[in-house]
């Protein structure tokens, strides 16, 4: 339970696949989620198809963000932030998207730089982990991009990289057919390997995977993603249609469609880190909420 009068913050996360709301407060040093909502919108799919967001999709995003902010206000949030991830960076009219969201919601709206997105995901994942060791790597596979961050509990993020390839983007490029042909599967693996070829992350004692792909994989193979586990999951997914994946594992159809692509990305990340990935409980929204709570606390002395 969160005490009456506790400071509350609302984070609206505008991603390639979904628009999500987190309303949270801090209780006994822990971040407590008071409300979470998710609306599938597919901004990244339209960006991949045409390079920009059309008027209809912009209007949909504005309406969903407005509803999320209205809900956050009803729940008594002291601060609400709208954060735009890859759609704001990858769409030709990303600035227009941010402007429309700002006008629709009346709250601060920011297009995150890749490094900012990665750092927030790192803070959110580490803060919600059970007794993390000193050095931790965090991988956040989004729809349009992937962030990989290594840092220390005492010092924060120290090594931050972003790859312009995510689960939705890879699906649109080479994995539209489900189940895929062997040619498509080979092409997907080649694209992933090429995207990560220059990444050599420092050693970490633990690694956390955040994002929708990791959460969905937990339903299939559990919370510990070893190389054999990820490879097995990829083989299973490559033999199924998205409808079958959704039915077999109780996963949303839209997530099932991009799950193989996300798994291939995580498999490459795990290979480069050299240690198992643990599915995290927090990510970018939790990191942003913690930052907002810290800033509010500092402002009030």
Predicted regions, residues:
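Early-domain small/polar-rich strand-loop-helix modules and first-structured segments
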Residues: 1-38
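Helical "lid/coupling" subdomains associated with nucleotide-phosphate turnover
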Residues: 6-9, 23-26, 41, 46-75, ...
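Extracellular/periplasmic ligand-binding regions of membrane signal-transduction receptors
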Residues: 80
């Amino acid at each position: 339970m969160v005490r009456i009068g506790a400071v509350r913050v609302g984070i609206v996360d505008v991603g390639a696949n979904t628009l999500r709301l987190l309303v949270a407060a801090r209780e006994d040093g822990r971040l407590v989620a008071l409300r979470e909502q998710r609306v599938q919108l597919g901004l990244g799919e339209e960006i991949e198809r045409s390079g920009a967001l059309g008027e209809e999709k912009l209007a949909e995003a504005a309406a969903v963000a407005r509803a999320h902010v209205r809900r956050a206000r009803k729940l008594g949030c002291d601060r609400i932030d709208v954060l735009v991830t890859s759609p704001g960076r990858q769409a030709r009219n990303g600035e227009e998207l941010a402007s429309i969201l700002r006008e629709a919601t009346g709250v601060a709206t920011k297009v995150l730089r890749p490094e900012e997105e990665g750092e927030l995901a790192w803070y959110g994942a580490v803060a919600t982990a059970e007794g993390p060791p000193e050095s931790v790597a965090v991988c956040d596979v989004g729809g349009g991009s992937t962030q990989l961050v290594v840092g220390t509990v005492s010092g924060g993020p120290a090594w931050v990289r972003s790859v312009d390839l995510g689960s939705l983007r890879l699906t649109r490029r080479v994995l539209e057919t489900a189940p895929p042909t062997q040619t498509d599967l080979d092409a997907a693996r080649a694209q992933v390997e090429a995207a990560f070829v220059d990444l050599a992350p420092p050693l970490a004692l633990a690694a956390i995977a955040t994002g929708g792909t990791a959460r969905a994989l937990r339903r299939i193979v559990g919370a510990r993603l070893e190389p054999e586990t990820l490879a097995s999951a990829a083989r299973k997914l490559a033999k199924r249609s998205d409808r079958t994946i959704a039915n077999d594992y109780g996963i949303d159809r839209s997530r099932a469609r991009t799950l193989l692509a996300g798994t291939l990305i995580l498999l490459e990340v795990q290979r480069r880190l050299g240690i198992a990935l643990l599915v995290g409980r927090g990510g970018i929204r939790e990191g942003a909420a913690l930052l907002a709570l810290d800033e509010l606390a500092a402002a009030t002395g």
